[in-house]
A protein has these predicted regions:
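Periplasmic OmpA-like peptidoglycan-binding domain that tethers envelope proteins to the cell wall
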Residues: 104-170
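Periplasmic peptidoglycan-binding/tethering modules of Gram-negative envelope proteins
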Residues: 34-98
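Bacterial N-terminal signal peptides that target proteins for export
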Residues: 2-22
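Helix-termini ("caps") and immediately adjacent flexible loops/tails
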Residues: 6-7, 40, 56, 89, ...
């Protein structure tokens, strides 16, 4: 039995020492660790489109209830503007509803700094919605800073998910 295993073991060792095999393995390992910037903005993008029209679930699933921000920024990105446009259309279609825009930040920075950043993010979303026709009195803002993370972890993937503004439908 040892004669049968010995050639296979020696063949595996020679393959493992081959620089091309090592380079291929490292490339595959690094590609598996690459992060995707195109995170879904809504549950609808995940294929969860069965919601009652005019409900919070409809808003979340079919419109998108959250937008994301770059690090230390409250500027509305192009992908966020598209989501806010859909939110404005939904609010025009359902005039009996209002929203609360919750501003959030990742874990980096002080509590006070992140509360202020969350407030700037919530206000940026509100101001954008108002600029495209949503009455200001239908939009309330609140900042939670870093106090309500949706993703735990001290890495870029978690931080990216926590740099957000979430619109919650209220009646």
């Amino acid at each position: 039995m040892s004669r049968i295993q010995a050639p296979a073991t020696s063949r595996m060792q020679s393959i493992a020492r081959n620089p091309a095999v090592i380079a291929l393995f490292m490339t595959l390992a690094l590609a598996g660790c690459a992060s995707k910037k195109n995170l879904p903005n809504s549950a609808g993008e995940l294929g969860l489109n069965n919601a009652t029209p005019g409900s919070q679930q409809d808003f979340t699933v079919n419109v998108g209830d959250r937008i994301f921000f770059d690090t230390d920024s409250s500027s509305i990105r192009a992908d966020a503007a598209a989501t806010l446009d859909r939110q404005a259309q939904w609010l025009q279609k359902y005039p009996n509803y209002a929203i609360t825009v919750e501003g959030h930040a990742d874990e980096r920075g002080t509590r006070e700094y992140n509360l202020a950043l969350g407030e700037r993010r919530a206000n940026a979303a509100k101001n954008f919605l108002v600029s495209i026709g949503v009455p200001a009195d239908r939009i309330r803002t609140v900042s939670y800073g870093k106090e309500r993370p949706v993703a735990l972890g001290s890495n870029e993937a978690a931080w990216a998910q926590n740099r957000r503004a979430v619109s919650v439908v209220v009646q």
